[in-house]
Amino acid sequence: MNTISSHSPIHVVGGGLAGSEAAWQIASSGVPVILHEMRGVRGTDAHKTDGLAELVCSNSFRSDDATSNAVGVIHAEMRMAGSLIMAAADRCQVPAGGALAVDRDGFSEAVTKAVHDHPLITVVREEVTGLPPRDWDLAIVATGPLTAPSLASAIQTETGEDSLAFFDAIAPIVYRESIDMDICWYQSRYDKVGPGGTGKDYINCPMDEAQYNAFVDALILGDTVGFKEWEGTPYFDGCLPIEVMAERGRETLRHGPMKPMGLTNAHNPTVKAYAVVQLRQDNALGTLYNMVGFQTKLKYGAQADIFRMIPGLENAEFARLGGLHRNTYINSPTLLDPSLTLKSRPGLRFAGQITGCEGYVESASVGLMAGRFAAAERKGEAISLPPATTALGSLLGHITGGHLVTDEEPGKRSFQPMNINFGLFPELQPGSIVKPEGVKRFRGKDKTIMKRQLIARRALADCATWLGQESTLAESA
């Protein structure tokens, strides 16, 4: 017999963007919630206040264009779902062109006040030093990239030594459709067929000696981002920034990630490439490819300019640029089920940046979903996942299984934090993109814009349907 009443509280650990949003969604569903936040008792190296949802870096939530920008689409979906984070951001907006930027102090104060004022939310200022106790039958861990060492250790003990990363090492990701396949070709090194492979699992970009030397020079001269004082220098074996490798010797890269051995240019088989940049499929949809071994601390502008020097990537569009940061996150594709529940511990969910999403709104959106899922579970309702065609659903799908983990590197390095982008969405149905009347040539940028507009329109329509279905369930419960 179930002795847990429908009014037993759900516990949320962490009062950042994800935790605050999760608590709000739970309380908005009529379920009490206890929000545990350690700041006020113990600080972090990055936070300056004890306010909820403090923004420690930029004050920008990025593009607010819901017609053709994936970030704008997730903004719109979160607003439709009654997001506290988006409501506070809209209330505290400051001028920023097409972006949604906020007064950071006012934003945190607005979130803090809303959470404290909600009658179903209790805020407890304390450090949770281990995994939530089992008598917290439903709980969400949303402790973010600066998770306290004691809790991180407990998570690692529960999930396994290789399941938790403490720094991300992000290589750029390129939209497949922007790669010039008249220059590049598909081939695995030595035509090796790995598990699930075909022997043609990589896209290869060839360089001659002059191109290689110019590329190395650009890497060495490129502007880089320094580590924060509290981050230290987390270089570890097999994960050096590409520009650091270039500085260690002109030939280092062509004997490392850019080695040409075992590869034959399908367009020019008799000419041996001096160096080769490889891109590996990053998601199950096959829309995104990551640049193998290209983790970097180069500034974003420098990355785009330098990486477009690579033959075949002259017109590359990047879904994500590279980076190396202090960041605690779990290997979500192997550890979490589709409702963000830890497979080894029913009732315990993870949310926010610790799940391997990247960005303010992405973190908050995962908190939104975790909160809704936990509330539904508490009320005995079937958990309704957002459709894969929505921004929420596409991000959820990537975190909980859409990323392809390879056997060639440890899982925690293979799975790296991801922001929302159109490469995570399912493709449109064939024939969806129709050339406008009166237009003679319809390709390139114009076609891409229409494609993204159609994906955005589909996402918002499907999200509205999903939320309407949830409302019907709630009303009939």
From Swiss-Prot:
KW NADP (keyword) present: yes
**Per its Swiss-Prot or TrEMBL entry, what cofactor is needed?**
FAD
Q: What is the protein's major site of localization?
A: cytoplasm
**Root EC class:** transferase
Task: Name the InterPro entries for this protein.
Answer: FAD/NAD-bd_sf, MnmG-rel, MnmG-rel_CS, MnmG_N, TrmFO
Superkingdom as given in the UniProt entry: Bacteria
A single Gene Ontology molecular function, please?
flavin adenine dinucleotide binding
- EC number(s): the record gives 2.1.1.74
Which keywords does this chain's UniProt record carry?
Answer: Cytoplasm, FAD, Flavoprotein, Methyltransferase, NAD, NADP, Transferase, tRNA processing
One biological process term in Gene Ontology:
tRNA wobble uridine modification
Q: Which GO terms describe its cellular component?
A: cytosol
Catalytic reaction annotation? uridine(54) in tRNA + (6R)-5,10-methylene-5,6,7,8-tetrahydrofolate + NADH + H(+) = 5-methyluridine(54) in tRNA + (6S)-5,6,7,8-tetrahydrofolate + NAD(+); uridine(54) in tRNA + (6R)-5,10-methylene-5,6,7,8-tetrahydrofolate + NADPH + H(+) = 5-methyluridine(54) in tRNA + (6S)-5,6,7,8-tetrahydrofolate + NADP(+)
> Could you tell me where this protein is found in the cell?
Cytoplasm
Q: Where does FAD bind?
A: G14, G15, G16, L17, A18, G19
Give the function comment from the record.
Catalyzes the folate-dependent formation of 5-methyl-uridine at position 54 (M-5-U54) in all tRNAs.
Question: What is stated as this protein's family in its record?
Answer: Belongs to the MnmG family. TrmFO subfamily.
Q: Write down what this protein is called.
A: Methylenetetrahydrofolate--tRNA-(uracil-5-)-methyltransferase TrmFO
Give the organism the record lists: Rhizobium johnstonii (strain DSM 114642 / LMG 32736 / 3841)
